[in-house]
Curated annotation (Swiss-Prot):
GTP binds at residues 166-173, 191-195, 213-216, 283-286, 310-312. Monomer. The keyword Transmembrane helix does not apply. It holds the Pfam family GTP1_OBG. Residues 1-159 form the Obg domain. GO terms for biological process: ribosome biogenesis. The gene is obg. An essential GTPase which binds GTP, GDP and possibly (p)ppGpp with moderate affinity, with high nucleotide exchange rates and a fairly low GTP hydrolysis rate. Plays a role in control of the cell cycle, stress response, ribosome biogenesis and in those bacteria that undergo differentiation, in morphogenesis control. This is GTPase Obg.
Length: 345
């Protein structure tokens, strides 16, 4: 399944500055020759692939991106100041298409790549350029050339930075709806979620990041039980795992039963998957008797880091977002591969 982040924008490069009509004005020289300078070049709009960028969130809010115009030429043959190029960072894997035709214009895959999307207009020539042997005092100059304007659609195949795993009914859908933009179907029975959901989390500090709610993994998932293989493939492509546990289901005689079951399925499917960083989160602490269950789990779990929260009430979710934002910032950005074959959507 593809998770697509999209943005529709208009990019406009800067107009060239007009040339100047000017003549030398010096003492004792009644009729100086033309000395109008050329106008400055308009600024270009440039896309640069930046591995620190994970989403198109900022571009979705901008809509119109406009570079600076070039400045007019000046007397004394002074060239007008060029408009500053506008460099827009985009995530690697961004596909740029024409909104009207759907034609693929650029496929930005390599970090650090710079592509001029809209070239700035050329500055107009000053009147000095038009002086000839027969027309020594031209009183006109050239206007600056207009910039370019394009209506673009940007697409990014998202790889979730964070995957939420846990047994059915652990509260994954409720949690992702609380901390992100995702709105999955939620009900109080197992297997409500039958397909992965993706939500964007906007932390107070740091870059937005993507969280995937991976449908309930059950015993035998690595062998294909339920939709096991399909779900585990999604987990494999995330960077960090939230291991979500329903405290109401913790058994006093074996508090780590659910925790061990999920980790066993992950390790049997892929050794790489089993080594992914995990943040253990105990959910539903708003329920009666939950804190006793939390203590039972902590005692069996040992000194490892874990977090308690209630996805239903929101208690503890702000802290979870802070921890995830910090952990993601400490890891290298996920490698993204752009796919131009839209026929397999």
């Amino acid at each position: 399944m593809r998770f697509i982040d999209e943005a529709s924008i208009t990019v406009i490069s800067g107009k060239g500055g007009p040339g100047c009509v000017s003549f030398r004005r010096e003492r004792f020289i009644e009729r100086g020759g033309p000395n109008g300078g050329d106008g400055g070049k308009g600024g270009s709009v440039i896309f640069e692939t930046d591995p620190a960028k994970r989403t198109l969130f900022d571009l979705r809010r901008q809509k119109i991106i406009r570079a600076k115009n070039g400045m007019p030429g000046l007397g004394s043959n002074k060239h007008g100041k060029n408009g500053v190029d506008l460099i827009i960072p985009v995530p690697p894997g961004t596909l740029v298409t024409d909104q009207e035709t759907g034609a693929v214009l650029f496929d930005l895959t390599e970090p650090g790549t710079r592509i001029t999307i809209a070239k700035g207009g050329r500055g107009g020539q000053g009147n000095k350029r038009f002086a000839t042997s027969t027309h020594k005092a031209p009183r006109f100059a050239q206007p600056g050339m207009p910039g370019e304007e394009f209506h673009l659609k940007l697409e990014l195949k998202l790889l979730a930075d964070v995957g939420i795993v846990g047994l059915p009914n652990a509260g994954k859908s409720t949690l992702i709806s609380k901390i992100s933009s995702a709105r999955p179907r939620i009900a109080d029975y197992p297997f409500t979620t039958l397909t992965p959901s993706l939500g964007m989390v906007i932390p107070d500090f740091g870059e937005p990041f993507a969280v995937a709610d991976i449908p309930g993994i059950i015993e035998g998932a690595h062998e294909g039980t339920g939709l096991g293989i399909q779900f585990l493939k999604h987990v494999e492509r995330t960077g960090i795992l939230i291991h979500l546990i329903d405290v109401s289901q913790i058994e006093p005689d074996n508090p780590l039963d659910a925790f061990n079951l999920i980790n066993t399925e992950l390790s049997l499917y892929s050794a790489t998957l089993a080594k992914k960083p995990q943040l253990v989160v105990l959910n539903k602490i708003d329920l009666t008797g939950s804190m006793e269950k939390v203590e039972q789990f902590k005692k069996a779990y040992g000194t490892g880091e874990l977090l308690t929260l209630s996805a239903a009430t929101g208690e503890g979710t702000a802290k979870l977002i802070q921890i995830l934002a910090r952990q993601i910032a400490e890891h290298k950005p996920l490698e993204r591969k752009s796919e131009t074959d839209h026929g397999n959507k």
